[in-house]
Amino acid sequence: MSTLHIVCSHCHAVNRIPSERLAQHPRCGKCKEALFSGHPVELTGSSFQQHISRNDIPVVVDFWAAWCGPCKMMAPAYAQAAVKLEPQVRLAKLNTEQEQGIAAQFNIRSIPTLIIFKGGVELARQAGAMSAADIIGWINSHV
């Protein structure tokens, strides 16, 4: 029985979950909320590093901005992808206007940009809006 570390999307506590329990709707040991809600996690400067480095599952981050038309168009597709991919993959969003330092750190030049992280390391990136099927296909091809 292997154990996975999963960061809570609500309180950001790290939870140890047996891998066979992932599909059984596990809850956070600290705040008691569901670890997987079927929605992308909103990241901030204080929670970003915790999620990309402490989760044992891959984390896909959508770097976006409120003024970006393609970002707004892709948001529902990204949310649909979260429903399909959880709990094997965590989908998250980072507002580049509010977190300019992180956007600069990862050299985000166009938005939306998706980056797949595993163990804090970037595995792949894709710029431009995509459909839910394209997002799922792209993620599955890299994890």
Region roles according to the model:
Residues C31-P40:
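Short Cys/His-rich micro-motifs in 6-15 aa windows
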Residues L43, F63, M74-G101, I108:
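Thiol-based oxidoreductase modules, predominantly thioredoxin-like and allied folds used
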Residues N15, L35, A75:
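Cys/His-rich microdomains that often coordinate metals
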Residues I17-P26:
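Short linker/helix segments within small regulatory modules
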Residues V14, V41-V59:
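A short beta-strand-turn-helix
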